[in-house]
C-alpha cells in the first residue's frame, strides 16, 4: 500500500462516527501497514486480531474500513490469507464484511472484465498515444510505467507514440532537461519519436480560451488563491462568476499582456458538482516572466486545459495515464465537448507505480543536489533512469519488470529487492568474472614450491557463457589474499586456489591480530572437492587498483543517510584493463556484481553482495 493510500484511510477513519479506541487501533494498524514488510503486515494483523478478541462490539463501519484496507493491497492480502487460520477473530470480521460487500465486489469484477475487453480492443486498430513529461528534471522510475504503457500500446497496435514536452510554466528553464529526457529515452531504447511542445500551440490555446469566454463558459477572476481554494472545496460560486463576457474578454486580453495582475481565467462548469475538478478550474494564470519559446504572452494555460485540446489536435486516440487523474477525465471530456473538437480520445487508466523508500519528488531531488548531498540527477542513489543505470540496472530487466506489472488499476508497492533480483538474472550471463582482493590489510602470500617464471593461462571470462571471450590469468610465486581469507586459513590446512588448484598452508604470520603473510605450497594433485575453503586471489605482480563503491539508502527516517556511499579499494587481476567498453557489468568473484562506471571505478549492484561462509 502506498503511504498516500494509508493517509486517505486515516482521513476516512477520522470522519467516521466511531469510538476513540477504534480510531487509535486503526491508526496503529496503519502505522504497521505503511512500512510494507511481511513482518509489519503480520504485526498489523495480530494487533487487530487481539483487539477483536477482547469482546469488542462489532461495528459495520469499522468492518468495512478494515476490509477495504486489507483488499487494497495485494501483498498485504496474501499475508492475511496465509495466516487467516490463526487470526480467528479478525477472520470473523473480514468474512462478515466480505459477505455484506459481495454485490459491490461482483459489480467491480464485471467492470474489470469490461475494462479488459476495452483494452483488448485497443490493439485492434493502430493507436496514437502520447507521453507528455514536464522537462523540469530527468526521467525517474516513477515516469516509467506511464511511458511504457503508452509505448507498448502504440507498438502492439502498430501505432505511434508522440513525445510532447509540457513546457507551460514560463518560470522554468526547460531546454537543458529536454536534452536529458531524450537521453533517458535513448537509454531505454525508445527513439525516433515525433516531438512537439505544448508551447507550439499557445496561440491556438488563446483562441480556444476566447471561444469559451464568448460562449459564457469561462470568466476572469481576481479571487485570492486561498479564498478560491475554500470556495471550490465548499462549492461556493466566485463573486466574478457572472461578469459579462465582453468585460471578461477585455480583462483576459490584458492578462495575456501582463496588465491584469491578480487575475486568472476559469472555466465555468459546475460549482455544485461532487467531482471537485469540475468546480470552475483555472485554465490560464498570470506570470511576470516571458516564455523561452514564445515571447507573445505573460499568461499561460494550465496542464488540464492544454491536454484535451492538444491531444485532440495531434490525433491522440488513447490517453493512457495514472488513475490519480481519473477524477479529471470528466473535466477533459467537458473541454472536448464544449470546444467542439472532433477527435475525442479514449481513456486507459492504470495504477501509479509506488516504490518503497524512494525519493521521486523533483523538489526534494533539487534540494539534495543544491546541498551537495548528491552529485546530480545521475547520482546512483537517485531513482532516475541515469542514476539506476549507474547503479547497475540493465534496462532490459527494468523494462521487463515494469511491463510485468501491466496496466492494472490495482495499487501495489514495489520492493526494490524484486527488481534487483530480476536484474541479476539478466546481468549474470553477461558479466565477465574477475578475481579481486580488498586492499586494506591484504595478505601477501608466498608460494614456496613455485617452479620457473611467472606465466599466464587463458580461461573463459564467464564459464557459463563462453561467447563473452577469454582472459589471461597471471600465475606467479607471490599472491594477494584478503584479510578475511587469510584470517580463516589455518596452518597445515589444505584449501583450493580458484582457477588453479589445491595448496597447503605451511606458515601463517600474525601481527597485532592482523595476518600479514602466508607461506603455502602447491598441491595441485589434491581433490578440490575435499577442501572447505575456496580462495580467490590476485598475483601481486601486475595487480590493478580499482575502486568499488557500495551505495545504500539515501534517506533514513527522512534524514540524509551519511553512510549512503562507502568506498573500498581492491586489487584486481590485471586482465580487467582489457575489458571491452561494451561490457559494463562484471562479477568480482566471491564479492558481488559491479557496474563499471568509469575506468577502474565500479559500483556494487544492490542485492548481489555475496555472504562469505567458512
Swiss-Prot record:
Record GO biological process: glutamyl-tRNA aminoacylation
Pfam families: tRNA-synt_1c (PF00749), tRNA-synt_1c_C (PF03950), tRNA-synt_1c_C2 (PF20974)
Reaction equation(s) it catalyzes: tRNA(Glu) + L-glutamate + ATP = L-glutamyl-tRNA(Glu) + AMP + diphosphate
Keyword Ribosomal protein assigned: no
Binding residues annotated for ATP, in chain numbering: 140, 324, 359-363
Record's subcellular location: Cytoplasm
Residue window of motif 'HIGH' region: 135-144
EC number: 6.1.1.17
Motif 'KMSKS' region in this chain: 359-363
GO MF terms, alphabetically ordered: ATP binding; glutamate-tRNA ligase activity
Gene3D superfamilies: Glutamyl-trna Synthetase, Domain 2, Glutamyl-tRNA Synthetase, Domain 3, HUPs
Key words, A-Z: Aminoacyl-tRNA synthetase, ATP-binding, Cytoplasm, Ligase, Nucleotide-binding, Protein biosynthesis
A single Gene Ontology CC term: cytosol
PANTHER family, A to Z: GLUTAMATE--TRNA LIGASE, GLUTAMINE-TRNA LIGASE
Homology family: Belongs to the class-I aminoacyl-tRNA synthetase family. Glutamate--tRNA ligase type 2 subfamily.
Protein name per its UniProtKB record: Probable glutamate--tRNA ligase, cytoplasmic
Species this chain originates from: Vairimorpha ceranae (strain BRL01)
Amino acid at each position: 500500500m502506498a503511504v498516500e493510500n494509508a493517509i486517505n484511510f486515516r482521513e476516512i477513519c477520522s470522519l467516521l462516527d466511531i469510538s476513540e479506541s477504534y480510531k487509535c487501533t486503526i491508526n496503529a494498524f496503519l502505522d504497521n501497514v505503511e512500512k510494507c514488510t511481511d513482518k509489519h503486515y503480520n504485526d498489523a494483523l495480530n494487533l487487530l486480531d487481539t483487539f477483536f478478541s477482547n469482546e469488542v462490539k462489532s461495528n459495520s463501519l469499522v468492518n468495512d474500513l478494515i476490509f477495504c484496507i486489507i483488499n487494497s493491497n495485494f501483498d498485504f492480502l496474501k499475508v492475511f490469507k496465509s495466516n487467516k487460520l490463526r487470526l480467528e477473530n479478525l477472520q470473523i470480521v473480514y468474512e462478515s464484511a466480505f459477505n455484506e460487500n459481495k454485490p459491490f465486489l461482483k459489480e467491480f469484477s464485471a467492470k474489470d472484465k469490461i475494462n479488459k475487453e476495452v483494452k483488448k480492443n485497443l490493439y485492434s486498430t493502430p493507436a496514437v498515444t502520447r507521453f507528455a513529461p514536464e522537462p523540469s528534471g530527468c526521467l525517474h522510475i516513477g515516469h516509467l510505467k506511464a511511458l511504457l504503457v503508452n509505448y507498448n500500446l502504440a507498438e502492439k497496435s502498430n501505432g505511434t507514440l508522440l513525445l510532447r514536452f509540457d513546457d507551460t510554466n514560463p518560470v522554468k528553464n526547460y531546454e537543458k532537461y529536454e536534452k536529458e529526457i531524450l537521453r533517458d529515452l535513448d537509454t531505454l531504447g525508445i527513439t525516433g519519436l515525433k516531438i512537439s511542445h505544448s508551447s507550439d500551440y499557445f496561440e491556438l490555446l488563446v483562441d480556444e480560451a476566447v471561444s469559451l469566454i464568448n460562449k459564457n463558459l469561462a470568466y476572469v477572476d481576481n479571487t485570492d488563491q486561498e479564498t478560491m481554494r475554500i470556495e471550490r472545496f465548499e462549492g461556493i460560486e466566485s463573486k466574478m462568476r457572472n461578469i459579462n463576457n465582453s468585460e471578461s474578454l477585455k480583462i483576459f486580453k490584458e492578462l495575456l499582456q501582463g496588465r491584469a495582475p491578480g487575475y486568472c481565467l476559469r472555466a465555468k462548469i459546475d460549482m455544485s458538482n461532487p467531482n471537485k475538478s469540475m468546480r470552475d478550474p483555472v485554465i490560464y494564470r498570470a506570470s511576470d516572466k516571458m516564455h523561452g519559446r514564445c515571447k507573445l504572452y505573460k499568461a499561460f494555460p494550465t496542464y488540464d486545459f492544454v491536454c484535451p485540446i492538444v491531444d485532440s489536435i495531434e490525433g491522440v486516440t488513447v490517453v493512457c495515464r495514472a488513475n490519480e487523474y481519473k477524477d479529471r477525465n470528466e473535466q477533459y471530456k467537458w473541454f472536448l465537448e464544449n470546444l467542439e473538437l472532433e477527435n475525442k480520445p479514449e481513456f486507459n487508466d492504470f495504477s501509479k507505480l509506488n516504490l518503497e523508500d524512494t525519493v521521486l519528488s523533483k523538489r526534494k531531488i533539487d534540494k539534495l543536489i543544491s546541498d551537495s548531498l548528491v552529485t546530480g540527477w545521475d547520482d546512483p542513489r537517485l531513482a532516475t533512469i541515469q542514476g539506476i543505470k549507474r547503479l547497475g540496472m540493465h534496462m532490459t530487466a527494468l523494462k521487463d519488470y515494469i511491463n510485468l506489472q501491466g496496466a492494472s488499476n490495482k495499487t501495489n508497492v514495489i520492493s526494490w529487492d524484486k527488481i534487483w533480483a530480476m536484474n541479476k538474472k539478466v546481468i549474470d550471463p553477461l558479466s565477465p568474472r574477475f578475481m579481486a582482493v580488498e586492499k586494506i590489510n591484504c595478505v601477501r602470500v608466498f608460494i614456496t614450491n613455485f617452479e620457473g617464471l611467472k606465466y599466464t593461462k587463458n580461461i573463459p571470462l564467464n564459464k557459463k557463457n563462453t561467447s563473452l571471450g577469454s582472459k589471461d590469468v597471471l600465475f606467479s610465486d607471490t599472491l594477494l589474499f584478503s584479510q578475511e581469507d587469510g584470517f580463516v586459513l589455518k596452518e597445515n590446512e589444505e584449501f583450493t586456489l580458484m582457477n588453479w588448484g589445491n595448496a597447503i598452508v605451511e606458515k601463517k604470520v600474525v601481527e597485532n591480530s592482523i595476518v600479514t603473510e602466508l607461506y603455502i605450497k602447491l598441491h595441485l594433485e589434491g581433490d578440490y572437492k575435499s577442501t572447505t575453503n575456496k580462495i580467490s586471489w590476485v598475483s601481486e605482480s601486475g595487480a590493478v587498483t580499482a575502486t568499488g563503491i557500495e551505495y545504500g539508502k539515501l534517506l533514513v527516517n527522512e534524514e540524509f543517510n551519511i553512510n549512503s556511499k562507502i568506498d573500498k579499494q581492491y586489487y584486481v587481476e590485471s586482465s580487467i584493463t582489457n575489458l571491452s567498453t561494451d561490457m559494463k557489468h562484471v562479477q568480482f568473484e566471491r564479492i558481488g556484481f559491479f557496474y563499471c562506471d568509469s575506468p577502474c571505478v565500479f559500483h556494487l549492484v544492490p542485492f548481489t553482495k555475496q555472504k562469505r561462509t567458512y
